[in-house]
Structures are given as C-alpha cells and as structure tokens.
C-alpha cells in the first residue's frame, strides 16, 4: 500500500503545505517503501541523481539494471553515473539509457575492504568521491552508492560537511512493523558507535523530519531504545536524553512515547526509534539474520514432504506477500542524515530490484527538497528551542 506523501508543516498547528520547497507540486505519493515500482509518479523537475556505478558486490551491471528499472517509474529523471567509462558505457548502451545517463569518468574504485582513512587520503579519483562531489557542486540533488559504508560516510562528511548543530550524523533506515504504513524509521544504524544525549536529541529531530517526509506522518511518535520502558532503567546518558527529547516534543513536532524495548521494533507503538549506532547496527544485523533464518526454516518445512509441498502451493499467495514484506531489497536504502546534502546507502549486495528501490527513495526525497527541510529542523536543536516550523517557513518564503 502506498500512502499519501506529505511534507513538513510550515506553521505549527496548520495543515501541511501543498507545494514542495522547489516551488513545484509535491509528489503525490509516499516513497514506495515496498520497493514495487508503479507507473509514473510526478516528481518535481528537473531532478538529477548521482549514482556510484562501482563498489557494490554485483558490479556496475546490477546498478545499471536498477537504473533501467527505476526509469519505468521516472521517465524524466536524469542520472550522473560515476565509474570507468570503458566499463560503464557499454552497459548504458546495452540498456538504451543514453538519453537519461551522463557518465562521469572515474578510474578508482572503493572496495569493501578499504579503510575510510585511506579513502579520505587517496580516494579523489574514485567513483564514490565523484558521486558525492556531484551533490556538493549542485550538479545532482541526491547521491546513491552501494559501496563501503564507512568509506561512504567518511567521504560524505569530508565533502559535504555536517549541518550546523549536528555533532554526529546518523544513518536512518526503514524497519518492517505493524504500523499502518508497514514501516517505522530507526536511527542510528551504524554511522557512529557513540552518541551523547545531545546527539540522541538531534537524532529524534532528524528522524521525525524524515518520518514526516518519507511516511507522511503529521506528528510522528518517537521512542528512545532502552533495556526497559521504566524511567529508572538505562544508563545516565539515556535518562538525560529522554528528558531533552521530551522537553523538545512540542517544538519538534513529534510525540515522545518514552523508552521503548527491542520487542517494540516490529510493533505499532512508535514511528521513530532513536538509538546509538552500535546498538542500531547490532539490531539491524540481528533482524536481517533472523529474517533469513526464518525464511530458510519455512522453505525447509514446505519442501519436506509431498503434503507440505501441496500446502505451500495452496498458501502461495500469502507466502509471496510475506516474502515481499520482509524482503530487504524492497526497503533498500539507508539515508545519511545530518549532512549538507542527501546521501543514500544501498545494500552492498543489492540487485536491480534493490538498486531501483534506493533510486525510488532518492527521487522522492529530491522532489521534496528534503535536505533543506531537514536543515531547518536540525536548526531547532542548535537554536535552543527555536520553532522549527518557523524556520522552515522562512526557507519557503526565501525561495
């Protein structure tokens, strides 16, 4: 199911604005977080996405296949594709993408084994660096890469710099749950293993902004991940963070539900789950591993006998819906929040479907001018209680 795609309100208590920050009609639908491509959805034009063709486990062919798949939904979207021209050009030609792709030649490739520090020192000739620079220079609105997460974050921070008021950027990702949209948002998923109370407050502000734009929620429910829901549980930094997030509830435009536990992640209690990068990444990998294990058990159970195979055939429709719900390819795309530009990290092993899902998310966030809206929301934290909605209204008026 695809929900209506809303933007953040421009005035507290007033209905959401119907124009995007680019002065064009807002996209009519929410990000297709299920990953299933639907027929053409209008997006503010012109939009250009910067795509790293290299670095993924499946090579540039999977990335170009993803672009071809995404183009069915966004025929007017243009792509800056970065990588060795000798490798990329034949793939573009074979998929008949010349009209929508401009190749940016970059000889170097960041591998999954490269250390972030090494890439920062000597990675200027890489496709990843070139991809981020396109956003930095204003040639594209959003960058997408399947490459090394640590290196991508390091290069993004170096080239785009952090937003004023952000100490530690975060990676936000969709998490399947029982909410009406089918997903909530969790951050940080591994950008930084540490997070102080002020950082967790910033994550709450950024996460709620992302939920408003990505899930169409007027007042997202924010929870702080802890070992229990009782106020006395957790370490001192978490308790301080809870007080700070609760105090900013009204001005931040979200509802703070307090502490949440791990079993709330797939539930319906919250829309935004805030935690440090260490905990978030462990939760992410645990969830992925559990989903894979459950799938293997189901496959084994439904193929163990003739009767079970018949049962699988009768339940094929329900099984396909379940697979689509938990398929990580269809919710592919972790967003780097807190930088002066939008960067989406696709899963390293993403196939065409996964890459297309990341591009879908990138196109929709670009169409909303999400980076500007997020910057205004983050300004709330550094301004010590300044009304974020007024800040966003100022951006709209300036445009």
UniProtKB/Swiss-Prot annotation:
It comes from the Bacteria. It holds the Pfam family FA_synthesis. It is found in: Cytoplasm. Keywords: Cytoplasm, Lipid biosynthesis, Lipid metabolism, Phospholipid biosynthesis, Phospholipid metabolism, Transferase. GO terms for biological process: fatty acid biosynthetic process; phospholipid biosynthetic process. Gene3D superfamilies: Isopropylmalate Dehydrogenase (3.40.718.10). One of its GO terms (cellular component) is cytoplasm. The keyword Transit peptide does not apply. GO terms for molecular function: phosphate:acyl-[acyl carrier protein] acyltransferase activity. InterPro entries: FA_synthesis, Phospholipid_synth_PlsX-like. Its EC number is 2.3.1.274. It catalyses: a fatty acyl-[ACP] + phosphate = an acyl phosphate + holo-[ACP]. Pathway: Lipid metabolism; phospholipid metabolism. Homodimer. Probably interacts with PlsY. Belongs to the PlsX family. Catalyzes the reversible formation of acyl-phosphate (acyl-PO(4)) from acyl-[acyl-carrier-protein] (acyl-ACP). This enzyme utilizes acyl-ACP as fatty acyl donor, but not acyl-CoA. This is Phosphate acyltransferase. It comes from Rhodobacter capsulatus (Rhodopseudomonas capsulata).
